[in-house]
Amino acid sequence: MFKQFLSKLPRKSSKSDSGELNRSSSGPVSSPVQRSGTSGGGSGPVRSNSGKRMSSAVFPASVVAGIEPLVPFKDVPSSEKLNLFVSKVSLCCVTFDFSDPGKNSIEKDVKRQTLLELLDFVASGSVKFTEPAILAMCRMCAVNLFRVFPPNYRSSSGGENDDDEPMFDPAWPHLQIVYDLLLKFITSPCLDAKVAKKYLDHAFIVRLLDLFDSEDPRERECLKTILHRVYGKFMVHRPFVRKSMSNIFYRFVFETEKHSGIAELLEIFGSIVSGFALPLKEEHKIFLWRVLIPLHKPKSVGNYFQQLSYCITQFIDKEPKLGSVVIKGLLKFWPITNSQKEVMFLGEVEEIVEAMSVMEFQKIMVPLFLRIACCVTSSHFQVSERALFLWNNDQIVNLIGHNRQAILPIMFTALEKNAQNHWNQSVLNLTLNVRKMFCEMDEALFMSCHARFKEDEAKQCSAAEKRKEVWARLENAASMKPITGKTAVLVTPRATSIAC
């Protein structure tokens, strides 16, 4: 088997091969390697001849120089090191099935040692990479890394399935070295971005982004670092990277609600947003409105909420006027039936409102505190507690104080109902503290609201008594003359202004 493994390596290139190299090096790669459903990074069986022909069409094998790949770098002169590099890289294009640890163990070890040699060589930065070397490297990474993942049948319900164990790829010992090699290669000062951009092109980047759907968290962590370096080094690709990431978010929010790497992608985008120049471009604001705010909608938002909040905070730090836009978006996607999400939303609201000016706060205070009033009276004590904790924030209390004429009438009924009826002692104590705070803030306004509350309460009691009397008369009339035949009964439901 070892002889068969070595026999796969190309020998001394012919003149026709050299001509093909010149032709292939003159233009960029048009598309990445298209792979069938084998597991990647060598985790599937050795590819068929048709698969190799397809790979050769994209990254031609003729770039391989005629030099023995198992020779150490230290044993060849400097003039031959790049040829040896290309030869070793081509050796690593052979893949194996890692689901069976005992299969092809010698060949796997040879490949692993070769990858480690390549890693040391790239890290040394001793030779400037030529176009054939870049081409061979991209081809090897495509063959080993790019693959189609099996369908993900896990639930997208987020926090409800936190006990799910992460899936680990059996090929990771090899995949990790390939990822480390790609990272060292991209960040190497010996790599000319102007030349490499022809091979690390849009198609390569799209396939790299597809790998973020891997269920192996180790792979996603490596991809996060690599994509960040690609974004930093290849400025010409930056708009395309942002657009491709947006497409992944769109597909996740509006179609599938299933993706393993949303948190990692958002983490990358957070660092991208922090580098945006001022004033913000319209396309960046559109990304906030159409992508980041709708990302609050999926059930699995808890899996990436921290990274999402960071991205939004970065936008607001860049342009504080966006705070009111974000609050309106949060109110639009407010999770009325999901208490855990409500707690998270309240935390994000606090972070945003804390940084708002009085003018921006006034734009959203009425709808915001209508929602907060509903949260305060929630029977779920964590929601009610988190809403009342807003009054522990001095900056928010200061904003409320400046606008108490509008906010206290909204909140008063919720506070009184809590003080009278809430079952949780902690919520009851917090309610009384907030109530006392409002009273000390403006006693005259507080007493006015209290009088109005008592008046409304009396009206409600009176209306309830009238309804009771009407029903009593109806029941009395019905008992004297029972309904006969097909008598239509019209019932009109009472409309409500806001759902709590």
UniProtKB/Swiss-Prot annotation:
Membrane spanning stretches: none
Question: What induces the gene encoding this protein?
Answer: Induced by epibrassinolide.
Residues of the region (Disordered) are 1-53
Task: List the SUPFAM superfamilies hit by this protein, alphabetically.
Answer: ARM repeat (SSF48371)
UniProt GO molecular function: protein phosphatase regulator activity
Q: Which UniProt keywords apply?
A: Cytoplasm
**GO BP annotations listed:** signal transduction
Question: Which GO CC annotations does the UniProt entry carry?
Answer: cytoplasm; protein phosphatase type 2A complex
> Locations of Polar residues compositional bias?
21-37
Asked if the Swiss-Prot or TrEMBL record annotates the protein with the keyword Magnesium, the reply is no
InterPro entries linked to this entry: ARM-like (IPR011989), ARM-type_fold (IPR016024), PP2A_B56 (IPR002554)
| Cellular localisation | Cytoplasm
Kindly state the subunit structure of this protein.
PP2A consists of a common heteromeric enzyme, composed of a catalytic subunit (subunits C), a constant regulatory subunit (subunit A), and a variety of regulatory subunits such as subunits B (the R2/B/PR55/B55, R3/B''/PR72/PR130/PR59 and R5/B'/B56 families).
* Similarity remark: Belongs to the phosphatase 2A regulatory subunit B56 family.
Name by which UniProt lists this protein: Serine/threonine protein phosphatase 2A 57 kDa regulatory subunit B' kappa isoform
Q: Give the species this sequence originates from.
A: Arabidopsis thaliana (Mouse-ear cress)
From the broadest rank down, the organism's phylogenetic lineage runs:
Eukaryota, Viridiplantae, Streptophyta, Embryophyta, Tracheophyta
